[in-house]
Design a protein with these regions (language model features):
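Eukaryotic tandem repeat interaction scaffolds
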Residues: 205, 225-232, 236, 241-260, ...
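Conserved alpha-helical positions within TPR/SEL1-like repeat arrays
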Residues: 6-24, 53-68, 100-118, 147-162, ...
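Defense-system signaling and execution modules centered on TIR/cGAS-STING-like, death/scaffold domains
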Residues: 18, 22-26, 34-37, 72, ...
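Glycine-centered coil turns and helix-coil junctions that link the paired helices
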Residues: 15, 21-26, 48, 62, ...
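Flexible helix-coil transition and linker loops at the boundaries of alpha-helical arrays
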Residues: 1-8, 43-55, 90-102, 137-149, ...
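Ankyrin-repeat and related helical/solenoid repeat scaffolds used for protein-protein interactions
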Residues: 271-339
Length: 354
């Protein structure tokens, strides 16, 4: 560093890029942390006053590394540091002079604000995410950069879906549906199968939540169709968690569809979907998600009992709700337990009247 500081800083920056790539590939937090340290070292030489473009490049790279570290941490400190790094980079990388770097920083900033908003349930952060993704699309025009254009719409859809949940405003779900459908204009199953499937899954999830406000059976059927489309690509072997989440979503939509139409004809399909998730969401590996699936299966049997299933269905419902309660306790997630207790009491009261 003393003899050739500029070259030393360049090597540190390049080392950081290599470590980020390796750390993400190996899901290795330690390597990504080392990358962040390498970028910080480079920034000791690459100051804004002396080397503004190199400084902005290393700040952008540091933001990328910190966003990778943040995947392993459930707090907000690392995310805030990453956002500050991207904001710094944007003071040099203007749209007029460095359009691609500017768009990349805007897109990455949108992802950071999305995660911050999700973790804090802060609508203002999610609105910042929306603004950043929309800004990126000023450069990522469909004609020149079709896949980047589609990516920005997919990311926007994810943020708008979260914003709908945080604000309880269904219009955001409608906006998210439009965003996902725009992404699907470029994401084709034949050419971009994984992104196509993830977008279908996002669309299915958003349509499910939209149906909660409009009680429209067609919206639920569209949700189920989108998630089933996603499962054509997202298999249990290649994407187990995505596969299980899609199965869970199908089960929830089928259950709700039966409630809207006042019929039990969808219960068998819903039960099969919830049961399928247990191949991935085991009690040992993911106790909280396992508990939610136990709760969902309890709802299936409770519904079946109300459609004439009799005493055995009530008893199965109680057993599944008890399992769910135990799973939530083991996971240290106590919020759903009072509601689960209420369900158990109600089922027992109904059973006593039989």
């Amino acid at each position: 560093r003393q003899k050739t500081p500029v070259e030393w800083a360049m090597v540190q920056n390049n080392l950081g890029n290599t470590l980020v790539t390796l750390g993400i590939q190996l899901n290795d937090k330690a390597r990504i942390n080392q990358a962040a340290d390498a970028f910080r070292a480079a920034l000791e030489v690459r100051t804004r006053d002396t080397f503004p473009v190199s400084w902005a490049t290393s700040r952008l790279n540091l933001g990328n590394a910190l966003s990778g570290v943040a995947r392993f941490d459930m707090g907000t400190g690392t995310l805030e540091e990453a956002a500050a790094a991207y904001d710094d980079a944007l003071t040099v990388f203007t749209r007029q002079r460095f359009s691609m770097d500017w768009a990349s920083a805007q897109n990455n900033l949108g992802s950071i604000y999305q995660t911050l908003g999700q973790r804090t349930r802060d609508a203002s952060r999610l609105e910042q995410s929306v603004a950043a993704f929309q800004a990126a699309r000023q450069v990522y025009v469909r004609r020149k950069f079709p896949l980047d254009w589609a990516m920005s719409y997919y990311n926007l859809g994810n943020t708008l879906q979260l914003l709908g949940g945080v604000t309880d405003k269904p219009e955001h779900y409608g906006e998210a549906v439009d965003a996902y459908r725009n992404a699907l204009r470029e994401y084709q199953r034949e050419t971009n199968p994984r992104q196509w499937a993830l977008t279908q899954a996002g669309l299915g999830s958003t349509l499910h939540w939209l149906s909660m406000s409009n009680a429209d059976p067609k919206t639920l059927r569209d949700s189920i169709a989108a998630r089933r489309a996603a499962l054509e690509v997202l298999t249990i072997e290649t994407a187990p968690v995505d596969w299980a989440n899609a199965q869970n979503g199908i089960g929830m939509s089928l259950l709700n569809l039966g409630n809207i139409e006042r019929t039990g004809k969808y219960l068998d399909e819903a039960e099969a979907a919830f049961t399928a998730t247990l191949k991935v969401f085991t009690r040992e590996s993911q106790p909280m998600q396992w508990a939610f699936e136990q709760n969902n299966l309890g709802d299936i049997h409770w519904n079946r009992a109300s459609y004439g299933g009799g005493k055995p269905e009530y008893l199965k419902a109680i057993a599944f709700f008890e399992n769910a309660k135990q799973g939530f306790t083991e996971a240290g997630y106590t919020i759903p337990i009072p509601l689960t207790d209420q369900k158990i009491d109600l089922v027992k009261q109904q059973l006593a009247k039989k």
